[in-house]
Regions:
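N-terminal subdomain of nucleotide-sugar transferases
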Residues: 1-31
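Conserved nucleotide-sugar phosphate-binding/catalytic loop shared by glycosyltransferases and other
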Residues: 21-67, 71
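Helix N-cap/beta->alpha junction signal
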Residues: 3, 89, 143-145
Length: 156
């Protein structure tokens, strides 16, 4: 997770996974919005296990993507998780899906299948969602229309 909305939406999922002894849940933060993220993780009692620290001043989207790829891939190589879970439409979602695909690690996507019908709007979020979808293993679509969008794209 990297943003405040991601943390808010994943907080109950993290809490449920950590309550269940069958799961060893590790929370990784990209450091996109450190202070806002920390407010949410503190409020929900979420311990962040790893910070990737990818943000730089005046960083371009391409620069962020490159830093995310290196940081996420390095972390996946060290941690070797059984599965990864991402949420939303950020560049982190796209890059994590690609890094997991390269390492043959299954990945789940919370809020999968949401579509605006215009790949350029919102930018880059709509493209992130569409590009990640074919690489994702488990799609957690929040609505029937999101599910239908995935099925319409040949993603199942």
């Amino acid at each position: 997770m990297g943003t405040r909305p991601e943390a808010i939406k994943l907080a109950p999922v993290v809490a449920a996974l950590r309550r269940d002894a069958a799961f060893a849940c590790t929370v990784v933060a990209t450091g996109q919005h450190v202070e806002m993220l920390r407010q949410v993780t503190d409020q929900f009692g979420i311990q962040v296990d790893a910070y990737l620290d990818v943000m730089r001043p005046d960083q371009t989207l391409a620069g962020l993507t490159a830093r995310l790829m290196t940081a996420i891939d390095d972390w996946l190589g060290r941690a070797a998780p059984d599965i990864a879970l991402v949420q939303g439409d950020t560049t982190t979602v796209l890059v994590a899906a690609l890094a997991c695909f390269y390492r043959h690690i299954p990945i789940g996507h919370v809020e999968a299948g949401l579509r605006t019908g215009n790949i350029g709007s919102p930018f880059p979020e709509e493209a992130n969602r569409r590009l990640a979808a074919p690489l994702v293993t488990l799609h957690f679509a929040p609505t029937e229309s999101a599910r239908d969008a995935l099925l319409g794209e040949g993603v199942s």
